UniProtKB/Swiss-Prot annotation:
Belongs to the ligand-gated ion channel (TC 1.A.9) family. Glycine receptor (TC 1.A.9.3) subfamily. Residues 272-276, 330-439 are cytoplasmic. This is Glycine receptor subunit beta-type 4. Glycans are attached at residues 29, 105, 151. It is found in: Postsynaptic cell membrane; Synapse; Cell membrane. Disulfide bonds join 166-180. It comes from Caenorhabditis elegans. Pentamer. The gene is lgc-57.
Length: 473
């Protein structure tokens, strides 16, 4: 009984294994039959034609040009690089043409996925004239397909990644707009043999999810043209991309920091004219910081002789900072030049008048004018600056009632005292003039910078922006 059960179990297992094997063999056979059917359809067509020449375009026997209709779907697009003058684009590229030699009686279109089989058919040798590099996608299978319709229409679809050359006009950078084109033409067939046309009313479609960090795709223009070469005239199709540069990044990274640096340089106008270390260090620091900022802005640009909008901005900001340094130099020179002729401390004229008044009071108290005040020790015109300053700071000069100040009887002549006071007044007058220059600078520098901003932004955003750059292919 047990042996019978064991035999039945073994027999059942063998049937399952054999049945599964037959199933997989059947599935492989079906797949192979389907592939053979597709290949047989194409080879049968080629055999029926007999002398099919894959190197001859379809209408060669009629001496007519073959029309190739093209269209594309832009899957992705990267930034437009100003330094390398190119951009990357990922597209699905479709071509359609009619080859009457491939007409067949099938009710449905024939799908061709084998690159070798597609190589047996004639197809246009289109290429992208201004592409630096181009590559097909092969993951997980070669990304292409071919449909052959009963009337001989051939539809070819593939996915291509391109690095496209774009000669940009950077005169308005970074407030610029660019026109970059993608030019398509045949390599071997001229206009008498092959004519390229855009297919349908909207042959260039764009993935709406495309986002570029520094550019905005405004619109796409497409047209056909005739290119003249020494060997003849070639038909070509052009897709022209109009892009605007995003300015937000440049405002945050360049325009706002440099504007703040210029404003900081104006702080020196509120410092005292004799605060030399503070004003010099402030001017030099702002100038060096602005130079560093300008160098960083130029690193993303090619070395070109054209004057760009960012160059105008950086140069003007540097001129404002340098002008602030010159203003301080002029003011400080005026003050110091007068000090060298007769250095007097601030309020020195008032001190002289006080000394004269005190002297007259003391003089009335002395009988017969035994001792009289002499200014000459403290106000000698030929003494150096440091000595004059120290003499006026001495206690003996400030306290006129001490006997040590009365060194001789003779009074200082009125004419000499007048000369000293005139010199002191001129020092004070020049100091006030220097302060007046600072006050004017506090208003004129910001006003000039505001006027520059108005003209700068109006010109580059409105006037210069109305002239779109010409497409260079």
């Amino acid at each position: 009984m047990h042996s019978l059960f064991l035999k039945i179990l073994i027999y059942s297992l063998m049937q399952c294994v054999l049945g599964q094997a037959e199933f997989w063999d059947y599935d492989e056979n079906v797949t192979q039959i389907e592939e053979d059917f597709k290949i047989d359809d194409v080879t049968r067509i080629l055999k029926r034609v007999g002398n099919y020449n894959r190197n001859a375009y379809p209408l060669l026997d009629q001496d007519l040009a073959t029309h190739v209709d093209i269209q594309m779907y832009i899957e992705g697009m990267s930034s437009f690089h100003a330094q390398s003058m190119d951009f990357q684009v990922d597209i699905y590229f479709q071509e359609k043409w009619v080859d009457h030699r491939l007409q067949h009686n099938n009710t449905k279109r024939i799908l061709v996925k084998d690159p070798k089989l597609f190589g047996l058919l004639w197809h246009p040798d289109l290429y992208f004239a201004n592409a630096r590099t181009a590559s097909f996608h092969d993951v997980t299978q070669p990304n292409f397909l071919v449909w052959i319709y009963p009337n001989g229409t051939v539809w070819y679809d593939c996915r291509i990644s391109l690095t496209v050359l774009c000669m940009q006009d950077l005169a308005r950078y970074p407030l610029d707009s660019q026109n970059c084109g993608l030019r398509i033409l045949s390599y071997a067939y001229d206009e008498e043999q092959l004519i390229i046309r855009w297919n349908g009313g909207n042959p260039v479609e764009v993935n709406r999810g495309i986002r570029m960090p520094d550019m905005h795709l405004k619109h796409i223009k497409f047209y056909t043209k005739r290119d003249k070469y020494a060997t003849g005239i070639w038909s070509s199709a052009v897709a022209e991309f109009h892009v605007d540069r995003e300015i937000t990044h440049h405002i945050i990274q360049s325009y706002i920091p440099t504007s703040l640096i210029v404003i900081i340089s104006w702080f020196s106008f509120w410092l005292d004219v004799e605060a030399v270390p503070g004003r010099v260090s402030l001017s030099i620091t702002t100038l060096l910081t602005l130079a560093t900022q300008s160098s960083a802005a130029r690193m993303a640009l090619p070395q070109a002789s054209d004057v760009k909008a960012i160059d105008v901005w950086m140069g003007t900001c540097m001129a404002f900072v340098f002008s602030a340094m010159i203003e301080f130099t002029v003011v400080n020179y005026c003050v110091r030049r007068k000090v060298r002729t007769k250095i007097k401390p601030r309020g020195l004229s008032e001190q002289v008048h006080d000394m004269v008044a005190q002297y007259r009071e003391k003089k009335d108290k002395f009988n017969n004018g035994n001792c009289e005040i002499s200014y000459e020790m403290a106000l000698q015109p030929n003494e150096d600056n440091a000595t004059v300053q120290r003499n006026f700071e001495k206690k003996e000069v400030r306290e006129m009632n001490q006997a040590s100040l009365f060194v001789r009887r003779s009074l200082l002549p009125t004419s000499k005292r007048k000369t000293i006071e005139d010199r002191i007044n001129r020092v004070e007058e020049n100091r006030k003039n220097a302060q007046k220059i600072d006050r004017y600078s506090r208003a004129l520098f910001p006003l000039a910078f505001i006027i520059f901003n108005i003209f700068y932004w109006i010109y580059y955003l409105k006037y210069a922006g109305s002239n779109s750059p010409e497409l260079l292919l």
